[in-house]
Amino acid sequence: MGNCVGRQRRERPAAPGHPRKRAGRNEPLKKERLKWKSDYPMTDGQLRSKRDEFWDTAPAFEGRKEIWDALKAAAYAAEANDHELAQAILDGASITLPHGTLCECYDELGNRYQLPIYCLSPPVNLLLEHTEEESLEPPEPTPSVRREFPLKVRLSTGKDVRLSASLPDTVGQLKRQLHSQEGIEPSWQRWFFSGKLLTDRTRLQETKIQKDFVIQVIINQPPPPQD
C-alpha cells in the first residue's frame, strides 16, 4: 500500500493560514497501482459516489481550487494508466510528491493535500454489478445508416485495441464488442474519456470524440478465488 493510508476517512487538511512545511524531496509519480481492501464490499456505483463526494467537498476545507482540479485530473489519468499525462499535469501545477504517490502532495506554497486511497484505485473487493442500463438501451441503428470508423481504446494493461464504431453507438454496445474481441467481461470494464467516466447509455456522439482520439478502459477483473 506504500505510503497511502487505507482508511476511507479523509483527514482534514492543515488549518487555513498555517501551511505545513513541504518535504524537501520530490519523487516522480510511481506507476504501480495501489492495492487496498475496503472495510465492506462496495459496488462500482458506491465507489463513484464516494469519489464524487470527496472531490465536491475537498476544496471547501483548505487549499487552492486549481490544485484540487489538477490533482483530480492527475488521479484519473494515473488510474487510466496514462502516467505521462498525470506527471505532466502535476509538473504544470508545480505539485510535488515526497513519496511518489498522490496520497500526500504539496503545492508551491507548501500547502499539503491528502487524497484518500479510494480516489486513486478501486478496492480489491469491489463488487461487480450488472446494471439495468443495457436493457434500457435504445435499439441499435440499422446497418443502412451506420457510418463506421475505427475507435481506438487503450486498456489499463497497456494494450491498444481498435473497435468498429459509429457515433450513435452506446458505450454498452462497445463494451460487448470489446468482450467479443478480447474476452473482457463488460462488467469488468470502466470507460473514461477526457477524465470522465462514461456510462453504458452514453453515446459516442455525446462525448464529442474526434478522429484519432483514444478512450481509456480500466479493467477491474476480480481476483481469483482463494482456497
UniProtKB/Swiss-Prot annotation:
Record-annotated Ubiquitin-like domain positions: 149-224
Annotated region described as Disordered, given as residue ranges: 1-35
CDD domains: Ubl_UBTD1
Pfam family, one: ubiquitin
Bias kind Basic and acidic residues: ranges: 24-35
Binding partners and assembly: Interacts with UBTD1.
Functional summary from the UniProt entry: May be involved in the regulation of cellular senescence through a positive feedback loop with TP53. Is a TP53 downstream target gene that increases the stability of TP53 protein by promoting the ubiquitination and degradation of MDM2.
Identification of the protein by name: Ubiquitin domain-containing protein 1
Gene symbol of the encoding locus: Ubtd1
